[in-house]
Amino acid sequence: MNLLIQTLTAIAACTVLATRASAQSTVVPINNEPAPKLIVEPPLPGPLAGGVVFIQYRVENLRILPVGGPAARNVSPRVGHLHLTVDDLPWAWADYGQSDTIILVGMPRGQHKVLIEVVDAEGNVFTKQTVTFHSPGKEIQP
């Protein structure tokens, strides 16, 4: 059992070190940074069945921080945030959180879509993805 624990600990440590080795430095400015990448998972089925939407995501090559304006364009590694639009509504909201999960509650019953945009500090879009799902939520009466 002791050997198993040591082996698992070594594997976990190597995984963490390998992940950090490819991470961007926050000390030295990076020239020619790779483009930001957005990885989005489908909503978690368990909470969705209960009417709560959990959309997990990951952003690479960009730090999500609550900063804005033209001066932020010169920050390295690159900074930005998310713009989220639900069901093509004419408005969106900015997400500066670092939870890596979008949570929506109270969605009415039916098919929905969420547009997730990775933007720079001035709102210019780097990349985007749309997630579609069916909510079993309450039926809305007109």
Features from the language model and the residues they span:
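Short beta-strand elements bearing conserved aromatic residues within extracellular beta-rich modules
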Residues: 82-84
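Short amphipathic, basic-aromatic surface patches that mediate peripheral association
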Residues: 58-74
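Short beta-strand segments within Ig-like beta-sandwich modules, predominantly Fibronectin type-III
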Residues: 92-98
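Surface-exposed, short loops/turns at beta-strand junctions within beta-sandwich domains
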Residues: 104-110
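Short beta-strand edge segments in extracellular beta-sheet folds
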Residues: 132-138
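Short, compositionally biased P/S/T/A/G/V-rich stretches that sit at domain boundaries
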Residues: 25-53, 140-142
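Short acidic/polar inter-strand loop motif in beta-rich domains
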Residues: 92, 120-128
